[in-house]
Regions:
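Hydrophobic/aromatic-rich core segments of domains that either
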Residues: 77, 96-152
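A sequence-level detector of short, solvent-exposed, charge-rich linear segments
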Residues: 30, 46-50, 54-55, 93, ...
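Short, charged low-complexity intrinsically disordered segments located at boundaries
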Residues: 59-65, 69, 105-113
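N-terminal accessory/pre-domain segments preceding catalytic cores
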Residues: 1-63, 70, 79-87, 140
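Active-site neighborhoods of divalent-metal-dependent phosphate/nucleic-acid chemistry enzymes
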Residues: 83-84, 88-93, 97
Length: 152
């Protein structure tokens, strides 16, 4: 119930305080996070990875000023929308959503998958995405060992 109240406040803010462009980005991000979450839960990873891009390749490291502005707008839309989704929208959902939204706008990205062990010696997985020289979601992977990367 608490999450619904937060979602309604966010929706009210979205309706009255944001530009039409931002409203469309937030709406796109909201629905895409749901689609990506569904894919993660219901599609075997062997099939899902084919949708992530070219395995073990990197995207270009330069961005134009216009591309940078688009990247930051999409980043903000996805990160902020992910706080209010009724489903779990963590790193992989966010990375896949950003990748899809930027790819739709002809901006290439590299999606990284990494692992490390926490203080209890438990394996932890993480996903982050880079566009140009900007780490868009998930930070720069810091302490995670990269096990796969996909360029799209």
């Amino acid at each position: 119930m608490k999450k619904l109240g937060i979602l309604l406040r966010c929706f009210k803010k979205l309706l009255f305080e944001f530009s039409m462009e931002d409203k469309l980005l937030f709406t796109e991000a909201f629905f895409l996070t749901g689609i990506m979450r569904y894919k993660i839960l219901h599609i075997p990873f062997d099939k899902l990875k084919k949708q992530l891009g070219k395995y073990n390749q990197e995207s270009k490291e330069e961005l134009s000023q216009d591309e940078y502005k688009v990247v930051m707008k999409i980043r903000n839309a996805v990160v902020n929308t992910s706080k209010y989704t009724p489903w779990e929208s963590l790193c992989l959902v966010q990375s896949m959503t950003v990748q899809r939204m930027l790819n739709k706008r002809n901006i290439s990205t590299t999606l990284y998958l990494g692992v490390n062990k926490d203080k209890n010696n438990e394996m932890k997985a993480h996903s982050w995405i880079r566009c140009g020289n900007v780490f868009v979601t998930g930070g720069d992977g810091g302490t995670y060992a990269t096990v796969a990367k996909f360029c799209k």
